[in-house]
């Protein structure tokens, strides 16, 4: 079983649960008489209570505003998983004349056995609320995938808590190059990632799920990006980053045993639940004009 598959176990279970859980109602993405605002998209009744509960940790309005999301933008979301951010981005872009490309897992990637299931669950999600989500175009990102979006077409590309997976799979460099190719000159690469403490030698496989911020910036610069600014929107000073099962010990995954092992029902989550979700870097990088 691949490193990437193991680290994304929570993604698969979340994606496959889309059809099993109670469905949030679909609403028209454009309220009568005015365009849908980002705040209204975040508050939308189509988002589940479980997803909304995570807003306190992920700060979607502040984060997307920091990256410069605008009405009518063309956005590429790499590896959307079960669609936590898609539930915000797709209705907002559909209502404002924008476009969302979802560069999902490469379904035929031999190193990721669950990829086809994850992609199929995501397609079902979009199909079941087609009026809400609009025309989301699903592309792919993986070891041998083609373009994530047409060249020089995107205003904003998003890497949302996935870079550690790509490092483990040896495709992080490709992610940066594919993002660079998709962006318009002057376009923005927005990164949210679990942040390791600075100093020492970076773990190039990100085995515990944390990545040094300086190393992320270095990879981006090597692909041609310019660092515009950083933010502490998603920082969590309570995160000690020394958890027994890596970042996945914390919510929302709450792992209780080593990767690939059955969950331990006797594991005490209290300490880790009190920390909350991980300390995360939030970066805004630019493709030069």
Task: Spell out what each predicted region is.
Residues 269-289:
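C-terminal lobe and adjacent flexible extensions of AdoMet/dcAdoMet transferase-like proteins
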Residues 2-18:
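N-terminal secretory signal peptides and thylakoid transit peptides that target proteins
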Residues 41-63:
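Class I SAM-dependent methyltransferase Rossmann-like catalytic core
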Residues 173-185:
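A short glycine-rich, Lys/Arg-flanked "PGG" loop and its adjoining helix->strand segment in the class I
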Residues 186-193:
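Conserved beta-strand signature within the Rossmann-like core of class I S-adenosyl-L-methionine
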Residues 22-24:
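Bacterial signal peptide processing site
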Residues 148-157:
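A short acidic, Gly/Pro-enriched loop at the edge of an enzyme's catalytic core
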Residues 73-81:
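Conserved class I S-adenosyl-L-methionine
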């Amino acid at each position: 079983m691949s490193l990437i598959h193991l680290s994304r176990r929570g993604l698969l279970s979340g994606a496959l649960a889309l059809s099993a859980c109670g469905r949030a109602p679909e609403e028209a993405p454009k309220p009568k008489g005015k365009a849908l605002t980002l705040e209204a998209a975040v508050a939308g009744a189509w988002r589940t209570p479980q997803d909304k509960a995570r807003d306190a940790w992920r700060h979607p309005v502040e984060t997307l505003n920091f990256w410069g999301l605008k009405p009518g933008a063309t956005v590429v979301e790499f590896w959307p998983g079960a669609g936590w951010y898609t539930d915000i981005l797709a209705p907002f872009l559909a209502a404002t004349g924008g476009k969302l490309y979802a560069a999902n897992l490469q379904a035929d990637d031999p190193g990721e056995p669950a990829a086809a299931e994850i992609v199929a669950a995501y397609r079902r999600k979009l199909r079941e609320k087609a009026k809400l989500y609009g025309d989301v175009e699903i592309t792919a990102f993986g070891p041998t995938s083609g373009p994530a979006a047409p060249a020089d077409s995107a205003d904003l590309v998003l890497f949302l808590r996935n870079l550690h997976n790509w490092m483990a799979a040896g495709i992080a460099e490709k992610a940066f190059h594919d993002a660079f190719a998709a962006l318009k000159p002057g376009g923005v690469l927005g990164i949210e990632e679990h942040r390791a403490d600075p100093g020492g030698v970076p773990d190039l496989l990100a085995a515990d799920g944390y990545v040094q911020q300086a190393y992320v910036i270095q990879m981006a610069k090597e692909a041609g990006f310019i660092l515009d600014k950083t933010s502490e929107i998603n920082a969590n000073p309570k995160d000690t980053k020394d958890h027994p099962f890596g970042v996945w010990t914390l919510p929302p995954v709450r792992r209780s045993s080593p990767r690939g092992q059955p969950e331990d029902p006797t594991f005490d989550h209290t300490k880790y639940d009190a920390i909350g979700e991980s300390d995360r870097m939030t970066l805004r990088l630019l493709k030069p004009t």
